[in-house]
Every structure is written in structure tokens, then in C-alpha cells.
Amino acid sequence: MYELQQHRRFSALDEMLPAFYYCYLLCFPVSSDNRAGTSELLQTSLSSLAEERPYLTGTVRRDMESSVRKGHLILDIPNPFEDLRIVFNDLRGPKSQWKETYQDLKDTGMPPHKLDANLLAPLTAGIGETRKVMSVQANFIHGGLLIAFCFHHNFVDAYGAGRIIARFSEHCNGTVDLKNSADPEGDGTGSRGIADLLDVELLKKQYKFEDLESDPNLWRLNCLEFRGVNDFRWPDFIPALLPVRKPPVISSMFSFSSDALAEIKAMAQPSQSGAWVSTNDALVAFLWRHTMRARFPSSITESEPPNRKSNVVVALDGRKDLSISPTYIGNCLFHCFTDLPINMVGSESTHLGDIAIRVRQTITAARNETLLKAVVGLAATHPDCQAIKYANDNLGPDLYVTSWIDLPFYKLEWGPLGKAEFFRIPDRQFESLCCILPPKDGVVQLITSMEEDHSKRLRSDAEFTRFATHR
């Protein structure tokens, strides 16, 4: 069972993130004559989930006069209870902008560039016109259903979003009995809704900002620019669409078979005796190399300026390292930076294993309980959680890789809907990020957003496409 924590309050790590929404899509084949029954199932189940955990109906408020610190986040939960209503969107009419059938999309592998967030998502990525913590939209197209789940990033990370969706599926599947179910014991959040080691007020009694601010590693594990205060401020809530990037960014999806992943891992075997890298380390190194070659072609011949550095950043879920309950849905996200000269990353003479082992060493070093507690301490004692600046240029010399391999979307049963056939994100949602999707039938897919010229260069890279199939 995917139980959720009983109560919810914002943590130090929640407050280090910008106020934006992100969207996940689950895709199901559904016949046209099942719309009424499907709609009733979804709304009844979401209402049941909201009744079980009323904080899911809440809104985010930033308190600029808080005694805790400037910009402290507060979760406002409606009292009396307000239901969480699904937006039902029928895209099957003759005047609809939507043209593809579900079978059309399925035949082409459900490509992200066909999934327009402006049509499918209740809260488009980057828009903060509402302060809801989550919203759901059910999009009916000919032959199918695309369910969009939008989450406020201050409220949940990818793991937390996945757990909420999984709990929703259990309500759809009829496996939750609210009258007889016991609240999860020992979730570590108690009635306050926050684990002690993430609580801003408690941490401010244990740590001092001036004792931590001189360590650049603590900033980077928070994904923040070293001492990046005062010169930049996030708005309370992003009020409109984020500006269009120039040059524009396009999304591409690539597939890696299990055989391709095994071969990449073999290529990335470190030269040092006894050294080990995971398949994920090898894939990150492979993606880093070929992304930098696409963006900086002269790095292949080591012709970039010798002092130019590149970072690959790997998202790390710290729940196990900090012994935080799996029922906790708030942000527990850390950011592992590995930096190398860009010529070394792109060079034909660099062994892939030399890159992969550096990625592994960075991740291993970050999985240290004392270190991560200090990272949270810095997050908690930062004097103004709006005056923060992020540390990497993901469309330039840096690459951010986030992996959703462990999210359970393809395992979930949704009652009469069965299992989802596809998990996707809308087009250009995570601009500049490389997102590794949960595996399906042994195949790992990833979605990457790049400037168009860079994307074309990547797709024409023979060494890259020997392992990766463009979808």
C-alpha cells in the first residue's frame, strides 16, 4: 500500500525550490462509450483521496513577515473541507485543436512533442496563477484517456508525486477502506507534518548560517549558487508563462534497450582495479559526453578553452540516507555535481570509465548522513528563501539528469482502466533537463530538451545513435 503521511508542513528543503508546477501524464486506452463511467470512477476516487488526506486540497502561501524567516512557506488547508475536483476535458469534438487519436499516438510511441501542455495540463509548467498544491485533468481523446497530474514543486518532489498518484490508483482500484484503515505508524512527522531533521524552526536552533555558508559543497548539494544572495529574487509566485527561450528548445525522446545499457556499462568499466560503477552512472557519463559534444563540437578534438568546465548534476533522493519514512512526500532532493574540463568530457581520447567513476565518486560522497544534515542546515538557516540563485546553466556547459526509474507508474492498477500504457511529460516541460523515465518491457526511455541545432547534432551522432533509438 502506498500510504501517505498523516499531516503535511513545509520543510527547509521545500523552501529552497522555485514556485513552479510540473506535470506528469498517464495514458490509457479507453473506448468512447466508457467516458461517463470513467469520469465517475476518477472523481469518486480523487474525492476519497482528498478526504483521506485533506492537505492535498491546500494552497501555498509565502509569508514575508514570518518570524521563522523571510519568505517562509505556509500550507493553507480549507476548513471546512473542500473537495478536490478533476477538470474534465473532451478533445474529441470537430472544433477541437486536438487531432491525433490514441492509436495514432500509440503507433508512434506517444512522442512528447505531440503532448501540448497548453491543451492537456490544468496548470501549465511555469504558471502560478493558482496556488493549489496539486490539480488533475482528465483529457478524453478518440480511443483514449490522458490524465494530467500537476504538482507544486514546493509541495512534493518526484518521489512524493509518484506516491500520491499511486495512492490515487489504490482508491480507483477499491483497495482503500477509509473507515477501517489505520493511519501509518511511525512516519516520523507526527501531528506537525514534518520530520525533525527537516524542520526549519528546530534546525535554526542547531545550526548557524555563518558556520555553514563558507562551504561551497553545501550550496551545490542544495543546487544553489555559492553565496548567491541579494542579487536575485524569485517572485512570490510566477505570474505567467515563462519567457520563450531564444533560440527555442525542443524535446526529444530516446530509447535504450537492455542490451544497449549493458554494452554502455561495459564501455564504462573503470580502469582502476576494484572500482565499480552502476548502470545509471554509465548512462549518465554517456549522456554527459554526447550532450557536450552536441553543444560544443570542438570539445571532441579538445579545442575548447582549457579552463572551461562542465558539470553534470544528478538528482539524489535522500530519504534512505536520512532515515526518512517512505510515507513522507515532501522534497528530499539533493543535487550531486561532478565537474570536469569540457575537453575531457567530449574528447575521443577520454575513456568513458574515467567519466563514470567520477560520477560514482560524487554520488558516494554525497550519501553521507552528517553531510546531508549540514546541507539541510544551510537550507534552514538561509536568511531569505526568496533570495536564492540556481547554480547551473543546463543549456550551456552543464547537464542536469533526473531519474524516475523507480517510480511505480507501470505497475499500478487503476480498477477498470487497468494499467497505464505510457508515462510521459508534456512537450518542453523540463527545459534543459534530461529525464530518465521508468522502464517498460526492459526498455529505458529518456526525454531531453535542447536547442534545435544541438538536438540535430545529437541525433546525427553515430556513436550515440548506435545505442539510442530516437522516438
From Swiss-Prot:
Record text on subunit structure and interactions: Monomer.
Disulfide cross-links: none
Origin: domain of life: Eukaryota
Protein species of origin: Penicillium rubens (strain ATCC 28089 / DSM 1075 / NRRL 1951 / Wisconsin 54-1255) (Penicillium chrysogenum)
Function: O-acetyltransferase; part of the gene cluster that mediates the biosynthesis of PR-toxin, a bicyclic sesquiterpene belonging to the eremophilane class and acting as a mycotoxin. The first step of the pathway is catalyzed by the aristolochene synthase which performs the cyclization of trans,trans-farnesyl diphosphate (FPP) to the bicyclic sesquiterpene aristolochene. Following the formation of aristolochene, the non-oxygenated aristolochene is converted to the trioxygenated intermediate eremofortin B, via 7-epi-neopetasone.
Gene3D superfamilies, A to Z: Chloramphenicol acetyltransferase-like domain (3.30.559.10)
Chain segments annotated as coiled-coil in the UniProt record: none
Enzyme Commission number(s) from the entry: 2.3.1.-
Gene Ontology molecular-function annotations: acyltransferase activity, transferring groups other than amino-acyl groups
Record-stated family: Belongs to the fumigaclavine B O-acetyltransferase family.
Induction: Expression and the subsequent production of PR-toxin take place under static culture conditions (oxygen limited), whereas no expression of the PR-toxin genes occurs under the strongly aerated conditions required for optimal penicillin production. There is a negative control of the transcription of the PR-toxin genes by the penicillin biosynthesis gene product(s), or by a regulatory peptide encoded by a small ORF inside the penicillin gene cluster.
Keyword annotations from UniProtKB, A to Z: Acyltransferase, Transferase
Pfam families: Transferase (PF02458), TRI-like_N (PF22664)
Protein name: Eremophilane O-acetyltransferase prx11
Annotated metabolic or biological route of this protein: Sesquiterpene biosynthesis
